[in-house]
Amino acid sequence: IDQWSEERALYQDALAELDSGAGNRYRDIRAALASYPLRIDLDFSTNLGLLHDMTPAEARAFMARAQGTPLASRLMVAYLRHKAQDRRWRAFLGVLDAPPAMVELQCHYYRALLATGDQAMAFEGAASLWNVGFSQDDACDPLFARWMANSGPDDALIWSRALKAFQAKNGRLIRYLKRFAGEALQRDLDEL
């Protein structure tokens, strides 16, 4: 019998209880797994079911406990997607110290800044995300729509994106960009 055989059996019982609704029996089993290394997996699964009411402080606390495991970033992504879907922008921003790495979440990040009053930073982020040689994630569409309605890209930014599209051999994007360009730039885009 190895050191963890009893805990392994309890862990399997805890997983079964989680699947069936995580009642009092689950809490008792989980408490018995205080030193079991995979207990954090149980906490992760439980937290996924609590995302709607989870506060930024609770999310940060779990991520601190799960630091060094993939579960910290997995909870962060799930939390951010959930808060973005619910448009709970202050809660979204409450777990971030910097813009996220994933483009989808960056788009939500700048939407959150826009919704909480930081229009300048939001539109700066929109311009940066827009200036690529390919179509961006659909999550960016609401941000781009607000940016376009407010100021949108100038011809220099349109030209920059067109050159990136040209390098990526994305003629469809170049044709799309023409609708935003001034008359002189439209002629230049025809030459690409």
What kind of feature is each model-predicted range?
Residues 1-192:
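Extracytoplasmic and endomembrane cell-envelope/extracellular-matrix remodeling and assembly machinery
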